[in-house]
Amino acid sequence: MKTKYTIREIETEKEMFSIFPLLIQLNPTLKKPDYKIMLKDMLRHGYRMVGVFHGKQCVGLSGFWISTKIYSGKYVELDNVVIDTKFRSKGIGKLLCDWIHAEAKRLGCKTAMLDAYEENKRGHKFYLREGYILRGFHFLKRL
């Protein structure tokens, strides 16, 4: 019997904060107070979030932004795609990406992009399988 999942946008700050235990599976050093501050700031800049649910449990999520860059035109950026460790390799990542890509197309985006941590080899394989290409390097400098 195939497991049934539902996918929907997570729209309230309260619900976005409630998924913190799932979010730290990808970002284990993130602290709740810091997340709360960052989330408020991100929401002011157009941040949105979508989740995949097994019953009432959020088992996968991704944030995303819509913006425009000179080299890409209007684009969607996937941010912190996280699948619960107990639910990986069950098609949840594809559900998230397909939903976000459809929403981005609806909003006139021509490109999807994302960053994946260098050590996230499984994620790299997944994104390549989904048609993403390696386009460059993402540099980070702490200020």
Question: Where would I find each of the regions flagged by the language model?
Answer:
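A short helix-loop-beta-strand connector motif used in the catalytic cores of GNAT acetyltransferases and
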Residues: K40-G51, E77
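Conserved beta-strand in the GNAT
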Residues: G51, Q57-I66, V82
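Conserved GNAT acetyl-CoA-binding A-motif
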Residues: C97, A104-D115
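Glycine-rich phosphate/pyrophosphate-binding loop shared by adenosine-nucleotide-utilizing enzymes
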Residues: Y5, K56-L61, V76
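Conserved acetyl-CoA-binding loop-helix of GNAT-fold acetyltransferases
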Residues: I83, S89-A102, R129
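A conserved beta-turn-beta hairpin within the catalytic core of GNAT-like acetyltransferases
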Residues: S67-L78, R88, L134-R135
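Conserved N-terminal entry element of GNAT/NAT acetyltransferase domains
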Residues: M1-E13
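Conserved active-site alpha-helix within GNAT-family acetyltransferase domains
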Residues: K94, R106, E118-G136, K141
